[in-house]
């Protein structure tokens, strides 16, 4: 395959996919510190959202934007550029033993999530060929797509496609190591926000900013030495985070992940339309799982304080859970306006993140790094449910016409890994789809409880903390563990028809023929290193 450069309009801002080393099985997650763990009841604390009233309901879906937005930056593009071959398999796949989990589901149901739909509420999803036509339009709440495309199937930002790829991409190429968690599942795409659009000034004043992304960047994790020929050492965040400057001269930081903030000035997307979309999915039974790698972060101002948009989302996720939809959300990333919850009292956080705040009905996902530790950018909180890989991410190149992958972006001329809780959440959403395939009689809340109960619990009181919740997900355990109440919940085994392609009998010998069937064991006999070419990406970003 050839590598391409993906361009997003602004000179000096680019994203590039480069070399990634093949990784073996990594160590389990390090034990979290004893401080800042959940302590007793949260009643009356800032960490607990005010309960819904009986009459609270989500807003009625209007099917489109609640404001008039205008494109300010051209969509992600590709152009012929460098050609870089890599030896590669994403570390997160090995860490989570996804191949083994997929084999279990396939043997039981005949597919790997083929009877499931996952709704992706994000920046839209490009119909990449590795989806094999399994992406359908949910709607567009930003603007009418270019060239008459169906709503939700344009990804100007290059974020939603990467999220959806982790859930359901299927390269169908043995030379490619990357694969989605549920590669037979269908994606229902809703474009709900975009940093390439802004409110049209002629249509009214902009929405006050309540959660800006960070202004800094971060260095790639140690050991990531893959660079494009003649490239610089990565020192900047992916452009989604607003890090870096042309020429890479801006001050960089190393504790930030990808932020997709709602209600940020100069971008498109509000909590109101997020709530509308959640209701749309629940009312129309559009999907059994929702992934939201978008959030709204604000300062915690005291017990009982909740904003109108937050209340609408709270009502919407309750509405969806009551109608048997599993709701998965990214826990959020540290930014200049979303400080880490590292205060002494875990029940009085500095930052409140929506939708994760509503943990009674949402499975919130924190991020770990490739060493098994908590990613520094992952926002802590009593609402964190589980954790999953969120660094050195590899997924589909979102540029229109691309047939490859991306694992790095460039801001200010410097390559940086794709990372964030945005990309940890789809691992969990994919596992939720597999659990729904294996256990079709479980309702949405029972699916969440199974994922939490089978996670790798941290060494903390009650088996959970504010960093990784109940722990890093364990897909194999989520699919196979015997839990109370499991009788009758497991999908019936799918009969397997064996083809009788035996050679003709040897009439000249009376010696019995013994046919030995060799199966795969639980151990890894050898690591097959795949060799393929990554795509490079360039993203347009406006100067600030």
Indicate residue ranges for each PLM-predicted region.
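Subtilisin-like serine protease catalytic core
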Residues: 102-137, 149-270, 288, 361, ...
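Solvent-exposed loop/turn segments at secondary-structure junctions
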Residues: 123-127, 141-143, 172-173, 193-197, ...
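Sec-exported extracytoplasmic/periplasmic mature domains
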Residues: 106, 168-172, 192-195, 279-286, ...
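Secretory targeting and sorting signals
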Residues: 1-38, 517-536
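Protease zymogen maturation seam
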Residues: 31-115, 129-130
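C-terminal subdomain of the subtilisin-like protease fold in secreted/lumenal serine endopeptidases
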Residues: 439-542
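Substrate-binding/access-modulating region of protease and related hydrolase catalytic domains
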Residues: 197-354, 416-419, 423
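Extracellular S/T/G-rich loop segment that most often corresponds to the catalytic His/Ser-adjacent loop
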Residues: 353-437
């Amino acid at each position: 395959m050839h590598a391409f450069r993906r361009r997003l309009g602004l000179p000096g801002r680019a994203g590039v996919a480069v070399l990634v080393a093949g990784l073996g099985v990594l160590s389990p997650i390090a034990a979290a510190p004893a401080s800042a763990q959940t302590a007793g009841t949260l009643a009356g604390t800032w960490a607990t959202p005010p309960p819904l009233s009986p009459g609270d309901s989500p807003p009625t879906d209007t099917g489109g934007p609640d404001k008039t937005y205008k494109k300010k930056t051209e969509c992600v593009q590709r152009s012929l550029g460098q050609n870089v071959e890599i030896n590669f398999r994403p570390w997160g796949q090995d860490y989570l033993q996804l191949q083994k989990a997929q084999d279990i589901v396939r043997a039981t149901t005949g597919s790997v999530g083929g009877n499931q739909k996952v709704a992706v509420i994000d920046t839209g999803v490009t119909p990449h060929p590795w989806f094999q036509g399994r992406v359908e339009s949910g709607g567009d709440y930003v603007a009418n797509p270019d060239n008459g495309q169906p709503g939700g199937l344009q990804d100007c930002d290059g974020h939603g496609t990467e999220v959806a790829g982790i859930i359901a991409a299927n390269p169908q190429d043995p030379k490619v190591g990357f694969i989605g968690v549920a590669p037979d599942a269908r994606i229902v795409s809703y474009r709900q926000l975009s940093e390439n659009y802004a409110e049209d000034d002629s249509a009214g004043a902009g929405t006050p900013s309540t959660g800006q992304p960070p202004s800094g960047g971060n260095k790639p994790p140690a050991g990531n030495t893959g660079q494009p020929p003649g490239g610089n050492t990565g020192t900047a965040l992916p452009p989604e985070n607003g890090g870096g400057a042309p020429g890479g001269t801006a001050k960089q930081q190393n504790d930030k992940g990808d932020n997709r903030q709602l209600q940020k000035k100069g971008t498109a997307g509000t909590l109101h339309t997020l709530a509308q979309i959640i209701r749309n999915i629940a009312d129309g039974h559009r999907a059994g799982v929702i992934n939201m790698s978008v959030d709204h972060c604000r300062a915690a101002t005291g017990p009982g304080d909740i904003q109108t948009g937050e209340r609408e989302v709270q009502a919407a996720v309750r509405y969806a859970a009551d109608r048997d939809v599993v709701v998965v959300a990214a826990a959020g990333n540290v930014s200049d306006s979303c400080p880490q919850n590292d205060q002494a009292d875990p029940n009085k956080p500095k930052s409140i993140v929506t939708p994760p705040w509503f943990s009674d009905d949402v499975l919130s996902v924190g991020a770990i790094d490739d060493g098994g530790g908590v990613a520094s950018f992952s926002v802590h909180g009593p609402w964190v449910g589980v954790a999953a890989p969120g660094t050195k991410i590899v997924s589909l190149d979102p540029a229109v016409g691309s047939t490859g992958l991306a694992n790095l972006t460039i801001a200010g001329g410097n390559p940086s890994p794709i990372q964030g809780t945005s990309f940890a959440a789809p691992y969990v959403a994919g596992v939720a789809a597999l659990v729904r395939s294996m256990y079709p009689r479980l309702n949405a809340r029972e699916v969440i409880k199974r994922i939490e109960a089978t996670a790798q619990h941290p060494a903390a009181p009650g088996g959970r903390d504010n960093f990784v919740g109940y722990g890093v997900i364990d897909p194999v355990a989520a699919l196979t563990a015997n839990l109370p109440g499991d009788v009758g919940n497991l999908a019936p085994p799918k009969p397997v028809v064996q083809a009788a392609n035996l050679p003709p009998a040897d009439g000249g010998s009376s010696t019995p023929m013994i046919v030995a069937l060799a199966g795969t064991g639980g151990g890894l006999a050898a690591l097959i290193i795949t060799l393929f070419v990554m795509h490079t990406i360039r993203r347009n970003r406006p100067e600030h």
